[in-house]
C-alpha cells in the first residue's frame, strides 16, 4: 500500500512547497517513486494550457512519476484568497469526495504520496468543512512546516496541538527560513521549537523562487519516513 502524508504549515507562505519538493526529491532519490498532490490551490495564473498554480507545478515537476497537471491539482482558482470564498464566488464547490478520488488514483501509481495543503491547518474548503476535516477523514500523518519568524512558536505549538487533538499523527516538522538572512533570534526560536514541539525537526530549508528546479532533496534525511 502506498504511504501518504499531509504537509501543512503554520501559515500561508511559510514554505510548504519548498518542503514538499524536498521530500519528493529525497524520496525519489531513495528509490521510492513519489507523487505530489495539491488538491486545492488559489493564486494562479492563466497560461496557454489554462490556469496554473506555481506550487502545484513544483509538485508536478518533482514527482517521480509522470503526472498530468489536473492529476496534481484538481481544484485551481485564480484569486489568491481562501478557497471557500473564491469557490463560492465562482459557483464551483469543492467536493471532498473528488479530493479523495484523486488521492486514490495517485496511490495506485506511486509508492509515496505527498499531499500539500493550502494555507494553514484549518483552511476552510466550504462554510462547513475545512482541510483539517478532510485530513482527519483520510487519516493522513501530518508534516508541519514552520516559517521561522516572530510569532512562529505560538503558531507551531497551536498547530501541533490541533493535529494531535484530531487524533492524527504528527510525523515531524521542517523549519523554513522565510525572511532571507536569518534574524538575530533565529537560533533561539529553533531551540525553543525543538523543546516545545512533540516531534523532531527533520531539516532546515530556505524559501526559494523556483522550487521546481532547485536541488532541495539532498538536505533532507527521510529515513524516518521510510520506516
Swiss-Prot record:
Q: This protein's superkingdom?
A: Bacteria
Any GO BP: biotin biosynthetic process
Q: Where is substrate annotated to bind?
A: 42
Q: Indicate where this protein resides in the cell.
A: Cytoplasm
Q: Which CDD domains did the record assign?
A: DTBS (cd03109)
Residues binding ATP are: 13-18, 55, 116-119, 176-177
> What transmembrane ranges does the database entry give?
none
- In the UniProt record, does the keyword Disulfide bond occur? no
The residues responsible for catalysis, as annotated, are: 38
Subunit description: Homodimer.
Query: Which HAMAP family does this one have?
Result: BioD
Q: What is this protein called?
A: ATP-dependent dethiobiotin synthetase BioD
Amino acid at each position: 500500500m502506498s504511504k501518504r502524508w499531509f504537509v501543512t504549515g503554520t501559515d500561508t507562505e511559510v514554505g510548504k512547497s519548498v518542503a514538499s519538493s524536498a521530500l519528493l526529491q529525497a524520496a525519489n532519490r531513495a528509490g521510492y517513486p513519489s507523487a505530489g498532490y495539491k488538491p486545492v490551490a488559489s493564486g494562479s495564473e492563466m497560461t496557454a494550457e489554462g490556469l496554473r498554480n506555481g506550487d502545484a507545478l513544483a509538485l508536478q515537476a518533482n514527482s517521480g512519476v509522470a503526472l498530468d497537471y489536473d492529476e496534481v491539482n484538481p481544484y485551481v482558482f485564480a484569486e489568491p484568497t481562501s478557497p471557500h470564498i473564491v469557490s463560492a464566488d465562482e459557483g464551483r464547490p469543492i467536493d471532498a469526495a473528488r479530493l479523495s478520488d484523486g488521492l486514490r488514483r495517485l496511490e495506485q501509481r506511486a509508492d509515496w504520496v505527498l499531499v500539500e495543503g493550502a494555507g494553514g491547518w484549518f483552511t476552510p474548503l466550504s462554510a462547513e468543512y475545512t482541510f483539517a476535516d478532510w485530513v482527519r477523514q483520510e487519516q493522513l500523518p501530518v508534516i508541519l512546516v514552520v516559517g521561522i519568524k516572530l510569532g512562529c512558536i505560538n503558531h507551531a505549538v497551536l498547530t501541533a496541538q490541533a493535529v494531535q487533538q484530531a487524533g492524527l499523527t504528527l510525523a515531524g516538522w521542517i523549519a523554513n527560513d522565510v525572511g532571507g538572512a536569518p534574524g538575530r533570534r533565529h537560533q533561539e526560536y529553533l531551540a525553543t521549537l525543538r523543546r516545545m514541539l512533540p516531534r523532531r525537526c527533520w531539516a532546515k530549508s530556505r524559501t526559494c523562487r523556483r522550487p521546481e528546479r532547485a536541488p532541495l532533496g539532498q538536505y533532507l534525511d527521510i529515513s524516518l519516513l521510510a520506516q
